[in-house]
Amino acid sequence: MSPLRVEHSHYVGPVSDLSHKDLLATEPGPPPTLLPEDPAVAELADNGRERFLEIVSAHPTSSLCWALLAEGSLKINSPEGNVGAYAYARTGYHRGLDLLRRSGWRGSGPIPWEHVPNRGFLRSLYALAVAAERIGDTVEQERCLQFLRDSSATAFAELTGQSQVTESSSGDRPQ
């Protein structure tokens, strides 16, 4: 006969019904957050050049669309382009934060680059760091780069061309 578990004086089944999780194992932190597919991606792939602004307008919550606008503005490398890039990147960043929270993210934990739908947010975050540097906001630049490092070592390496000096932390980010 298997032992019984009791919670609040209610029978909840035999102990054998418990998962066989290693109770001595330590969890490294919150689980990775995986964003849902971005509907703008298919449209951009099919006819992004011809209909780019139309697609952005149709998908204002797409971090990828805002990241692409920011990256394009950064290529101009002028005061106007840099300010525009900052605004576009900040929009993509905030749209991404909204979606991350709806996907269970609680302000910390990995946001893996390897999961393609996460890339729009991560690209917006990096573009925000670059644009912040160009307009002289080094505090914002450093905050964004640290957030990127904490969220995804792979994204940091891919986007900056640098490798991590230290292992990625748990992804804690005050918001």
What is the predicted role of each segment?
Residues 46-49, 119-123:
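Amphipathic alpha-helical repeat elements characteristic of tetratricopeptide repeat
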Residues 63, 115-122:
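Start-of-helix signal in alpha-solenoid helical-repeat scaffolds, especially tetratricopeptide repeats
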Residues 100-115:
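Acidic, Ser/Thr- and Gly/Pro-rich intrinsically disordered linkers and low-complexity segments
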Residues 120-126, 134-138:
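Acyl-donor binding region in acyl/amide transferases
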